[in-house]
From Swiss-Prot:
Pfam families reported in the protein's UniProt record: GreA_GreB, GreA_GreB_N
Single biological process term from Gene Ontology: regulation of DNA-templated transcription elongation
Oligomer and partners: Interacts with RNAP.
SUPFAM superfamilies in the cross-refs: FKBP-like, GreA transcript cleavage protein, N-terminal domain
Keyword terms: Coiled coil, Metal-binding, Transcription, Transcription regulation, Zinc
UniProt family annotation: Belongs to the GreA/GreB family.
Gene Ontology MF: a single term: DNA binding
Function: Inhibits all catalytic activities of RNA polymerase (RNAP) by partially occluding its substrate-binding site and preventing NTP binding.
Chain segments annotated as coiled-coil in the UniProt record: 1-74
Protein name: Transcription inhibitor protein Gfh1
Keyword flag Cell inner membrane: no
Length: 156
């Protein structure tokens, strides 16, 4: 049996939107490829080869998204008492007062550019957060080095 992929509801919806965009891109790439094939006298044309490669990349991305979504299990919102998959966690550096907001998600949803930053439960930081409660102080490896943070709030 294929392994399930745990996703938040928002993550599932985001991947569905990506799949729809990729399907639209595939239609456009197929159209361009057909036009190039019809107008090309030489099948070794580099433009034709590039179009074939782009179409193959899009098809691979669609296959990947369809695979993830077919195995998806949407997480129920947590109690907010203990950090788990899907939890949005507010952290505070006790020394500087700096605050950091992260959401613990599955690797399929991880994206450090999102706000809040979506970190994988399989990452060192994600693993360190799981199971903690408000008030707990934990040591995390961050891009700025090892730092201590206090769990200020847990949502979901």
């Amino acid at each position: 049996m294929a392994r399930e992929v745990k996703l938040t509801k928002a993550g599932y919806e985001r991947l569905m939107q990506q799949l729809e965009r990729e399907r639209e891109r595939l239609q456009e790439a197929t159209k361009i490829l057909q036009e190039l094939m019809e107008s090309s006298d030489d099948y070794d044309d580099s433009g034709l080869e590039a179009a074939k490669q782009e179409k193959a990349r899009i098809e691979a991305r669609i296959d990947s998204l369809e695979d993830i979504l077919s195995r998806a299990v949407i997480l129920e919102e947590g109690s907010g008492e203990v950090i788990g998959l899907g939890s949005v966690v507010e952290l505070e550096d006790p020394l500087s007062g700096e605050r950091l907001s992260v959401q613990v998600v599955s690797p399929a949803e991880a994206n450090v550019l999102d706000t809040p930053m979506k970190i994988s439960d399989a990452s060192p930081m994600g693993k360190a957060l799981l199971g903690h409660r408000v008030g707990d102080v934990l040591s995390l490896d961050t891009p700025k080095g090892r730092r201590e943070f206090r769990v200020v709030a847990i949502h979901g």
